[in-house]
């Protein structure tokens, strides 16, 4: 199963147009200089006097205690996914309502999540030549407030263009301090020095993913934070190079997520390849409301083996 070039180009064009023109007063122009300077994190050092922070629905571990149900997208264009349709508050209400399809007797409790594209790959190089645009702090804060009110996670998805995942992850320090905020890494949009998003399918070496999880694990431990979800999207075998070298980290619940759209049979086959030999890592499965041919029902998704621990809809 392979993502169609026309769809990838359409999404790149939609995101790129917003990077140039913005969304007026509702969202604003995406800042070329990113999220600003790193925050003062001294307040997270003294954790002895207060109880440790908890996850939105209690506890400090996400997987395997919960099944995560997520909606993906960004407010810049509806082509980027369902999460960006309507206000963040409306998106949170829709997420909570649709998550109920995955709950039931004998199943894990469901923890909803908003997967916001925090770094959007662009068809143009931008001022720094990195072919990506970071969301403004204003946009991220709006989704964080909505996620918090709905007792949901906020996952910041990174489409890095020609930048690297660690640099982009560190730009989100001020949000990762929050107990409900995690990361998603999208190797499809990790470009080499001469590659352009939308023209080729990207890839990443396991060492780069390991660098992100090592940094984030230290961050979690320093702040006595609950576990962080880190989702790694994949739909081709070559998207994660030297995949067997991926490392497990304290405080990190890493998910290997089967991405890509198509028929149920093709998606099931992709899922099998992605999770085969997964070792200590968790399982994820992504669906597309528009691009999938015959959208799988929640019952069909739950019949996959192993059962996905994270289910994402775009």
Model-derived regions: residue spans:
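N-terminal module-boundary/linker segments of secreted carbohydrate-active enzymes
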Residues: 38-89
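Glycine-rich tight-turn/loop motif centered on a GG-T
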Residues: 84-85, 125-133, 197-206
């Amino acid at each position: 199963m392979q993502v169609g070039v026309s769809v990838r180009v359409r999404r790149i064009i939609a995101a790129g147009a917003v990077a140039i023109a913005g969304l007026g007063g509702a969202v604003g122009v995406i800042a070329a200089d990113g999220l600003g300077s790193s925050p003062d994190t001294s307040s997270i050092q003294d954790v002895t006097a207060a109880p440790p922070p908890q996850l939105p629905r209690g506890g400090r571990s996400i997987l395997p205690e919960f099944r995560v149900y997520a909606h993906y997208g960004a407010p810049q264009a509806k082509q980027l996914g369902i999460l960006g349709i309507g206000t963040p508050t409306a998106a949170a209400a829709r997420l909570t309502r649709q998550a109920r399809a995955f709950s039931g007797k004998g199943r894990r409790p469901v923890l909803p999540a908003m997967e916001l594209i925090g770094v959007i790959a662009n068809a143009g190089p931008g001022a720094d030549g990195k072919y990506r645009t970071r969301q403004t702090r204003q946009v991220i804060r709006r989704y964080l407030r909505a996620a918090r009110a709905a007792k949901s996670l906020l996952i910041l998805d990174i489409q890095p263009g020609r930048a690297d995942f660690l640099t982009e992850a560190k730009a989100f320090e001020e949000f990762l301090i929050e107990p409900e905020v995690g990361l998603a890494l999208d190797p499809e949009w990790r470009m080499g020095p001469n590659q352009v998003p939308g023209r080729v399918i990207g890839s990443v070496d396991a060492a780069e993913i390991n660098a992100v999880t090592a940094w984030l694990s230290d961050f979690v431990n320093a702040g006595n934070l609950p576990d962080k979800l880190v989702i790694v999207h994949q739909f081709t075998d070559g998207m994660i190079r030297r995949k067997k070298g991926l490392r497990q980290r304290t405080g990190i619940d890493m998910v290997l997520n089967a991405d890509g759209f198509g028929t149920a049979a093709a998606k099931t086959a992709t899922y099998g390849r992605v999770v085969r030999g997964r070792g200590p890592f968790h399982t994820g499965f992504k669906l597309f409301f528009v691009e999938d041919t015959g959208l799988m029902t929640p019952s069909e998704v739950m019949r996959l083996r192993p059962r996905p621990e994270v289910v994402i809809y775009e």
